[in-house]
Structures are given as C-alpha cells and as structure tokens.
Amino acid sequence: MSSTYGENLKLTIFGQSHSPAIGVTIEGIPAGEKVDLDELQRFLSRRAPGKNAWSTPRKEADAPEILSGLVNGHTCGAPLTAIIRNTNTRSQDYANLAVTPRPGHADYTAEVKYGGYQDRAGGGHFSGRLTAPLCIAGGICLQLLAREGIAVVSRIASIAGICDEGELTSSTVEKDFPVVSDACGEKMRAAIAQAREEGDSVGGVVECAVFGAPAGLGDPMFGGMENRIAAALFGIPAVKGVEFGAGFGASKLRGSENNDAFSVENGKIVTETNHCGGILGGITDGMPIVLRAAFKPTPSIARTQQSVNLQSVTREELAITGRHDPCIVPRAVPCVEAAVAVAVYDALLARRKETR
C-alpha cells in the first residue's frame, strides 16, 4: 500500500481502523525543534469522533503516544514515531462485508487489489480513522510553520449546498463548527440533522488558506505547489475534488478578469487580486495560498442499498450497521489543515536546501 508522502519531510502512516493502534513515522524534521504536546492534543481533539450530533457515536480519545524522535520536548533528529490506540471498535458490525461490498466504499476495489486478504473491519487501511495520524504530522508541522510566521487556517465553505458567508482571514476559526457566519452554520447543521433523520448523509467543501508563505516555494510541472498540496489532500478519504484560487470559476472569466495585476505594498511585490490562489507556474508568489477541497457524502448510510454478492455474483440488498458520521465535513477541517501544513513544510525544507 502506498502510505508514504513527501520528499524532504517524509511521513508514513500505518495501521487500520480496528487494529490495536494507528500511527505515523515522520522523517526530516531538523533536530532541536520544540514540539508542544498539549497544543498537539488540542489540534487532534478538533478531529476526534463522538463529540457532537454531527459526528459518529464512536468515541476515541485520540491521545498520541510518542515512541521515538522526541527527547525532553524537542526533536532529536531520529525518525519521530507516534501512535494512537484504538479503544472503541466493533468489528462484528462488518462481518457481512466479506461477500457484499458497500456502495461508495473501497470494499470492492480492495477485494480486487488484495484478493480478500485486506482488513475489512471499519474500512481497514482505507478508513477515515487514518486521518488521525495525518493530524499528528500536520499538527507538528503547524507548530513549525508558525515559528516561520506561516499560518494555515480553514473553514467550512459549504455543506449540502448551503454556503458560508464572509472571508477567511489569518485568524483561526475557533469553533466546534468552524464557519465565519453562525447563521449559515445553523442552516448547515439543520441540513445534517435532516439527513441523519432520513437515514442519509451530506457532503460539502472545506476552504483553506495559508498566510505568510514566502514566494519561491514549489517547482514547475510535476513538483508544483498545487501538485504537492493536492497529493496530500487526496490522501484524505472522501476528498473528490481540489481547486486553487478561482479554480473552475476561472474558466468562466476573461483573461483581463482573471489576471492578477501586480503592485507594490510596503516595498513588497503583491497582486491586487488573488485569482491564482497564491501560486503561479507551480511556485508561490507570496500571496495567501487559497484552496478548496470537496468532500463526498459519507457513503455509510442507514438506508438499504443495492449491492452484489461476490460469491454468487448476483444482486443483493445491503443494510449497513455500525457508527458513522451523517456529515464528515466539520471533522475534516483540521484534516485539510494538516495535509496542507505537511505539504507546505516539505516545500519549505526543499527551498532551504536550494538557497543554502
């Protein structure tokens, strides 16, 4: 399985949804970097399940155990490995999936790829549970970036077609339901509650911005910042689309509308607009990096769905049990921040090598 990301900062995520533990090994962080474990725990708690009405009932503390790479609160240059114990699993809920794949999940494709040897319980290595170790890596990178004057912030841009209002700024949206407009948030929560009541689920979009990233990060073509960030984001289960700046909306504009005019502000080169999302030719231009990630509705729903029996190769109805989110978007916000932070810090390390 391909569960390793990065070049200068390299992380490998391991474990399954119902294995004894899940975790991450991070290589490339310079020795001597302070890691605030209390701050890391606060970040992980934003993603943790079982805290509210729009989350899965599965409760996990998501408390990281640092096994290596950290001495007296500072990185020591060795690979940093951390795990999170899985303490609230119910593998019996997935017993019928051996022959009947869930629509919208990776059950069928995993069966084809791994010949039935894959761990099916809770989705195994394909589970959103694996975003917890991603958030360990991302939470550490957020601390390292903050010391460089770089902030990564996100919000819920939309859920079930209901859009947030207002602008995302460099101030973190410190809310359990991270929207700028509380009125819009109430409408989104109502849509989630209705979907849950109807045995269904809804999706949405997370918007993320990186403030303070210097110009010059990234490379042309396949090493571009869009490529690096998108690769990390698509490692989050349920992400089905990523756009930067004006994104697909740019296709509706004329060049005279889409081009970001250059200007000077306090002796610094800036652009008057930011349709490019802070990236030109795969390289950051010093403006905020702005992106949006689209999340599909949670595929595990309470309604009976059409599937097939893989043994008899016949159509078969499937009723899914287990504990699932009616909408994963609120818990995905820190996951997006984590993925983006990892990608930006990896690019920052690359830039340091180039400019030595």
Which residues does each predicted region cover?
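Glycine-rich anion/phosphate-binding loop at the beta-strand->alpha-helix junction
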Residues: 14, 20, 135, 199-202, ...
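A short glycine/serine-rich beta->alpha loop
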Residues: 10-15, 118-130, 215-219, 276-279, ...
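N-terminal, positively charged regions that mediate nucleic acid binding
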Residues: 1-58
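Internal helix-turn-beta structural module
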Residues: 10, 300-356
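Short acidic, glycine/tyrosine-flanked loop/strand segments centered on an H-E-D-like triad
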Residues: 98-124, 306-324
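Glycine-rich, N-terminal phosphate-binding loop and its surrounding beta-alpha-beta segment
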Residues: 44-103, 107-109
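Glycine-rich, mobile lid/loop segments that gate access to catalytic sites or pores
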Residues: 113-221
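Alpha-helical support elements that line or immediately flank enzyme active sites
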Residues: 20-32, 128-150, 223-231, 287-297, ...
